[in-house]
Amino acid sequence: MPTDITRRTLLTTAGALALLPAPARSAPLVLTPGQTEGPFYPVALPADADSDLVRVQGAAARALGIVTHVGGRVLDRHGRPVPGAAVEIWQCDAQGIYRHPRAPDQQRFDAGFQGYGRTAVDAGGGYAFRTIRPVPYPGRTPHIHVAVIVPGTGRFVTQMYVEGEPLNARDGLLNSIRDPAARRSVIVPLRPSPAEPGALGGTFDIVLDL
């Protein structure tokens, strides 16, 4: 559960994203490509399932890893915010372990890391999470699973990748996206974040075929 400090940080991040100008209507938007959900979506959602994955209610310490702020906007194909949408993310911990009963080495999962979070978009379509920088594990480049739930439309699933990762060139799922522009749209640069000392930040806008 977020502390007052992290609540302020998340609100600041979300507010900054909401103030970004919407894409010009005449500019062609690249639809975010769908990707597989993967085998480790939570069987049961954690009791603490907010947008701050770095702090778990009752845990003695925060999550291992580099704190990373990930946010953006959920837009339709015309660049308009999608009202009422919710965004979920889930990922492995800093050791490459998922919070899931079938995940390898489950007994070593970092108790200070939520592993899953959910948030509603704001009026501008903005969302924000405080998580950790994704790490590789055997067979996969660093990535974060992302799902968008739109009332009356259904659930859209994709994955976010990190720019500059050497394993990107060999990742089968990333390279299954054949269109270069679509593939680039899910690769996000992570840079020092002004929201928190020592943290990284990246923007991942999600464009739905609506």
What is each model feature region?
Residues 27-187, 191-210:
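Beta-strand-dominated extracellular/periplasmic modules and repeats
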